[in-house]
Amino acid sequence: MPQKVRIALDAMGGDFGPSVVIPGAAISLGRHPDVEFLLYGDAKLIEKELAAHPALRKASRVVHTDVAVAMHDKPSVALRRGRYKSSMWQAIDAVKKTEADVTVSAGNTGALMAMARFCLRTLPGIDRPAIAATWPTMRGDSVVLDLGASIGGDAQHLKALAIMGAAMASVLFDLERPTVGLLNIGVEEIKGGEEIREAAELLRAMNSQRFDFIGFVEGDGIGKGAADVIVSEGFAGNIALKAAEGTARQLAEYLRAAMSRTWRSKIGYLFARDAFKALKDKMDPNKSNGGVFLGLNGIVVKSHGGTNAEGFAYAVDVGYDMVRYDLLTKINQTLNRDAGALVATPSAQEVVS
């Protein structure tokens, strides 16, 4: 376990670049003083933001890059134009070279996945990486994956996701045998496509001692906390994520409007202010920011591109926790134990951007 956690940041990533990344890193540093940052991007822009954060400046090293991956770049274009010389690539490469323990970027999802996969490669037995994140539920938190790394997936791919997600839940939630469910349109065994039904059969046949497969989980089961780990292919997983985030913002706006409609509601809000603040915090998507790319020979964390500084800080916190929990080692150990259960299959599936 390293004394210092070394975090490489793609300072040019996201909708706002250094104006969000640098203040966000400063917020996270305040919570984790044992962090050293490598900041990749336009040195002039980075230094301008660092001037307002002397503690972060002291804990950082700036590495200038001339190329930044645009949010609208296709993965193939980003690889061709930004391989080796972009802020995103160099931040990932720092993990490969063991100069950093984790990479965090708010940049283009498809480009980040393509570069991470190309630079770091996948773990043995893993055909494609997945994006996993913790999801607030009525029972605490669950790990949900894949949230949009790739589209589609056969039964073996879903099985690999279940194994990796269970390893992540075991580490984060200190569970000896987390429950695992497959996201489906119904809980009955006859529901869903051939791939998901076959995946369920494979997971039941494993009879794993490291997780408890409970079968299918419907969409509303995610928020209910029906399982410690919810597994889906990336298309449905990303839709579920965006729908939940949109619903949270919609409800927050409804509450704000209702509480400011009349003088009576305003007085009522004053009496219930603490409860409403707790609800707002629970529903804030920024506080669940930070998806982990599972299945790579290194740790990469993806932040929402449009997040604010506080939201980006939470993504940096996720990266910090993954290093301190030694997640990569734990996943490797789990995959090695279950090596016979995994069969990597080549795939040309499109990366979600």
UniProtKB/Swiss-Prot annotation:
Task: Show the SUPFAM superfamilies listed in the entry.
Answer: Isocitrate/Isopropylmalate dehydrogenase-like (SSF53659)
The chemistry this enzyme catalyses reads: a fatty acyl-[ACP] + phosphate = an acyl phosphate + holo-[ACP]
A GO MF term: phosphate:acyl-[acyl carrier protein] acyltransferase activity
Query: Which keywords does this chain's UniProt record carry?
Result: Cytoplasm, Lipid biosynthesis, Lipid metabolism, Phospholipid biosynthesis, Phospholipid metabolism, Transferase
One biological process term from GO is:
phospholipid biosynthetic process
EC number(s) reported in the record: 2.3.1.274
Q: Where in the cell is it found?
A: Cytoplasm
- Which InterPro entries does this entry report, sorted A to Z? FA_synthesis (IPR003664), Phospholipid_synth_PlsX-like (IPR012281)
Q: In which pathway does it act?
A: Lipid metabolism; phospholipid metabolism
**What is any one of the record's Gene Ontology cellular component terms?**
cytoplasm
Stated family: Belongs to the PlsX family.
- What does the annotation say about its assembly with partners? Homodimer. Probably interacts with PlsY.
* Descriptive protein name: Phosphate acyltransferase
To which species is this protein native? Rhodopseudomonas palustris (strain TIE-1)
The encoding gene: plsX
